[in-house]
Amino acid sequence: MTSIMLMFAAATGKLATVMTGALPTTGNGSTKTVTVFTPRGTIYDRNLLPMTNAQTRTVAVIEPTAAAVAAVSGQLGDNAAAALEKLRSGSPAAIEVPSEFECGDCLKYTVPLRYGEGRLASHVIGYVDALGAGVTGIEYAFDDVLGQNEPLKVTYRVDAVGRPLAGVAPEVSGSAEAASGVALTIDTQVQRLVGSVAKDRLDKGAVIVMESATGRLLALASFPDYSPTAVGEA
């Protein structure tokens, strides 16, 4: 893994180190493909602690069998209406499920949750749009690095009416793990302390902490804050 120093214009110069690695290979060549998850590079603090992708969720790729439909309906109920409609039409479906979900005709994957609980430095990190492209902050500035990952896909061989062939194992390509990431000069311990103190004293404004010897940005808290998963509510 190589390291490339890049500049990010935000209050100060030195902010991020980009880490790149080899991309995973993918396989194509079947009739029906389900995209399970498109990984995005992790944003780390200066100590390589993850500031994104720190938590996980479970995604299941489900074959359109009677047993699978019964499992989804029985365990997920109305929360899986769209997936059930797809399964009943004869197409496989990918759906987020509880980790304890059980189904004989499915593949389960643990994938990163981009923004989880206890997020820090929202204005620095920024957020992505519905298509997974960076809109603001580091997500936008390093979108070409964070977004250069092959999606995890499951490909089925199907019959003449588009239903997966019984007894034929699907082909899995790609990975849920990103091949690249960005390391910031932000220190999550300092960031957490600054955010905690400032939110009790500031309705509007910002607090910046810099390393005097180097000018590196250690923390930046801006208020009002926002959730990257509910930007419209900010």
Where are these regions (language model features)?
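Periplasmic/cell-envelope proteins involved in peptidoglycan metabolism and beta-lactam response
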Residues: 1-233
